[in-house]
Amino acid sequence: MKIRIGHGFDVHKFGAARPLILCGVEVPYETGLIAHSDGDVVLHAISDAILGALALGDIGKHFPDTDTAYKGADSRVLLRHCYALARAKGFVLGNLDVTIIAQAPKMAPHIEAMRQILAADLTSELDDINVKATTTEQLGFTGRKEGIAVEAVVLMTRKHD
């Protein structure tokens, strides 16, 4: 069995007059995130982790913000595309661990819905998907409620024939 680990990180700033979408879930908050796509910072970090595990670059390479085709793009579609690239190379998700770093809004009420969506989009068992959230104790840009940061780690496996 071949095993690959990928790490993804992304940050987006609050300020867009649109819904806050995280893992495909609309999270009630006063503002959304500024981005070329729908701004789903969690799915961007996960997509980067998958691409990184397979040495396929990053989401900026695959979905450049200079391409109008991705203006307002649904990040779930982008994530499924990244996972399809992994599947085409014979890899499947072993597990996913995500940390959402935000002072606000509170994520706890939305974590299970996020896990359900990720399990469906990554054709994985719910037990293979972990999403957690933390604050920075009011320190830094996330502590000042200026934006959200996310770290994602994936383990990808391929069985040899």
Swiss-Prot record:
Keywords: Isoprene biosynthesis, Lyase, Metal-binding. The record marks 36, 135 as: Transition state stabilizer. CDD domains: MECDP_synthase. It catalyses: 4-CDP-2-C-methyl-D-erythritol 2-phosphate = 2-C-methyl-D-erythritol 2,4-cyclic diphosphate + CMP. PROSITE patterns: ISPF. GO terms for molecular function: 2-C-methyl-D-erythritol 2,4-cyclodiphosphate synthase activity; metal ion binding. GO terms for biological process: isopentenyl diphosphate biosynthetic process, methylerythritol 4-phosphate pathway; terpenoid biosynthetic process. Its cofactor is a divalent metal cation. HAMAP family: IspF. Homotrimer. Belongs to the IspF family. This is 2-C-methyl-D-erythritol 2,4-cyclodiphosphate synthase. It comes from Shewanella baltica (strain OS155 / ATCC BAA-1091).
